[in-house]
Amino acid sequence: EVIAQLTMIAMIGIAGPMIIFLLAVRRGNL
């Protein structure tokens, strides 16, 4: 369904930056 696809895209769009942020915090780049 279109709704399912939009939900997956939204989750990836939100999770992507969060994962990058967490990795940056662990490495101490901030």
From Swiss-Prot:
Q: How does it sit in the membrane?
A: Single-pass membrane protein
Q: Indicate the family of this protein.
A: Belongs to the Psb30/Ycf12 family.
Q: Where are the transmembrane segments?
A: 7-21
The UniProt entry's GO CC annotations, sorted and at most eight, read: photosystem II; plasma membrane-derived thylakoid membrane
Q: Which UniProt keywords apply?
A: Membrane, Photosynthesis, Photosystem II, Thylakoid, Transmembrane, Transmembrane helix
Question: What processes in GO biological process is this protein linked to?
Answer: photosynthesis
Free-text function comment from the UniProt entry: A core subunit of photosystem II (PSII), probably helps stabilize the reaction center. PSII is a light-driven water plastoquinone oxidoreductase, using light energy to abstract electrons from H(2)O, generating a proton gradient subsequently used for ATP formation.
Matching entries from InterPro entries are given as:
PSII_Ycf12_core-subunit
Residue spans, topological domain Cytoplasmic: 22-30
Subunit structure, interactors included: PSII is composed of 1 copy each of membrane proteins PsbA, PsbB, PsbC, PsbD, PsbE, PsbF, PsbH, PsbI, PsbJ, PsbK, PsbL, PsbM, PsbT, PsbX, PsbY, PsbZ, Psb30/Ycf12, peripheral proteins PsbO, CyanoQ (PsbQ), PsbU, PsbV and a large number of cofactors. It forms dimeric complexes.
Q: What is its main location?
A: membrane
Q: Where in the cell is it found?
A: Cellular thylakoid membrane
Q: Which residues lie on this side of the membrane: Lumenal?
A: 1-6
Q: This chain belongs to which protein, by name? A: Photosystem II reaction center protein Psb30
Free-text comment on the cofactor: PSII binds multiple chlorophylls, carotenoids and specific lipids.
